[in-house]
UniProtKB/Swiss-Prot annotation:
Keyword Signal tagged: yes
Designated name of the protein: Apolipoprotein C-I
Leader peptide range in chain numbering: 1-26
Any one of the GO BP annotations: lipid transport
Cited Pfam families: ApoC-I
Superkingdom of origin: Eukaryota
Gene, per the UniProt record: APOC1
PANTHER family: APOLIPOPROTEIN C-I (PTHR16565:SF2)
Length: 83
């Protein structure tokens, strides 16, 4: 029973493989490839810039820079007192 079911499936797969790529799946020409790479790089740059801008805004809104500055000031003053 398994052999009877697997033979038609094998025939369909073999027919699809031998048929070759569809016209939409054919290899694109060089100019369209270069254009798509340019578009992808531009989009990547925008995405990175947006994420960086968001991260900087979050850091500015947090109190982390102030706490860090205060901690360094305290440590510097402690070192000055020791010397």
């Amino acid at each position: 029973m398994r052999l009877i079911l697997s033979l038609p499936v094998l025939a369909v797969v073999l027919a699809m493989v031998l048929e070759g790529p569809a016209p939409a799946q054919a290899a694109p020409d060089v100019s369209s490839t270069l254009e798509s790479i340019s578009e992808k790089l531009t989009e990547f740059g925008r995405t990175v810039a947006d994420k960086f801008r968001t991260a900087v805004d979050q850091i500015k809104k947090s109190d982390f820079p102030e706490k860090t500055r205060n901690w360094f000031s305290e440590m510097f003053n402690k070192l000055k007192e020791k010397f």
